[in-house]
């Protein structure tokens, strides 16, 4: 479920040495499954362990995960990175905002997962997003742009060279193309 690098494990052992006996760490997600999901790590003293917590053993400490956060921490990783600017813990949880879908889930669910977990984070840098409206019987993903993408002069390039290319690579033989059904209106909200 959660991978903690050797460097991060050593860092946690050092931090926990200054805490009361029996203190471990807690890895959690606030607002899991939403666009505002945030992950965190905190100390977990013995009296803060809940009956439904999942417990994972590491070198010199355990990591507690609450039942609600667990599915959103699938494939999560924690590392301790040192560079010229110093050192920091990094926590990556690719499924925090949306639960990973099974490989045999309906095509629309798998496309929506890729949109939410991979494409929308890229578009967010311009204040934009896309939403899957439907997948036609012919295998065309019908998309609607929102935020800064609505009315952006580069939307056609983003759609064909970015989104369509990415989705066709992910779903060969299932998806035949993408189509934008947004009624674009250029305004102050538009990126370009």
Swiss-Prot record:
Binding-site positions, [4Fe-4S] cluster: 149, 152
Keyword Iron-sulfur: yes
Gene3D superfamilies: Fe-S cluster assembly (FSCA), HesB-like domain
Keywords: 4Fe-4S, Iron, Iron-sulfur, Metal-binding
Cofactor note: Binds 1 [4Fe-4S] cluster per subunit. The cluster is presumably bound at the interface of two monomers.
InterPro entries, alphabetized: Fe/S_biogenesis_protein_NfuA, FeS_biogenesis, FSCA_dom_sf, HesB-like_dom_sf, NIF_FeS_clus_asmbl_NifU_C
Keyword Zinc-finger included in the entry's annotation: no
GO MF assignments: 4 iron, 4 sulfur cluster binding; iron ion binding
Any one GO BP annotation for this protein: protein maturation
Pfam family, one: NifU
Cofactor(s) the protein requires to work: [4Fe-4S] cluster
Subunit details: Homodimer.
Family assignment from sequence similarity: Belongs to the NfuA family.
Role description: Involved in iron-sulfur cluster biogenesis. Binds a 4Fe-4S cluster, can transfer this cluster to apoproteins, and thereby intervenes in the maturation of Fe/S proteins. Could also act as a scaffold/chaperone for damaged Fe/S proteins.
The protein's name in its UniProt record: Fe/S biogenesis protein NfuA
Source species of the chain: Shewanella sediminis (strain HAW-EB3)
């Amino acid at each position: 479920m959660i991978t903690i690098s050797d460097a991060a494990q050593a860092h946690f052992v050092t931090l926990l040495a200054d805490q009361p006996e029996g203190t471990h760490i807690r890895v959690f997600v606030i607002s899991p499954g939403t666009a505002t999901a945030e992950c965190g790590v905190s100390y977990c003293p013995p009296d803060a362990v809940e009956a439904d917590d999942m417990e994972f053993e590491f070198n010199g400490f355990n990591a507690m995960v609450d039942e609600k956060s667990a599915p959103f921490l699938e494939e999560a990783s924690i590392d301790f990175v040192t560079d010229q600017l110093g050192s920091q813990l990094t926590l990556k949880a690719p499924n925090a905002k949306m639960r990973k879908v099974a490989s045999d889930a309906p095509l629309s669910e798998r496309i929506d997962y890729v949109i939410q977990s991979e494409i929308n984070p890229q578009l967010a840098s311009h204040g934009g997003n896309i939403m899957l409206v439907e997948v036609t019987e012919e295998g065309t993903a019908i998309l609607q742009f929102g935020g800064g993408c609505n009315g952006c002069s580069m939307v056609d390039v983003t759609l064909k060279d970015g989104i369509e290319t990415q989705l066709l690579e992910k779903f060969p033989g299932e998806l035949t193309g993408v189509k934008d059904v947004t009624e674009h209106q250029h305004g102050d909200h538009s990126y370009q």
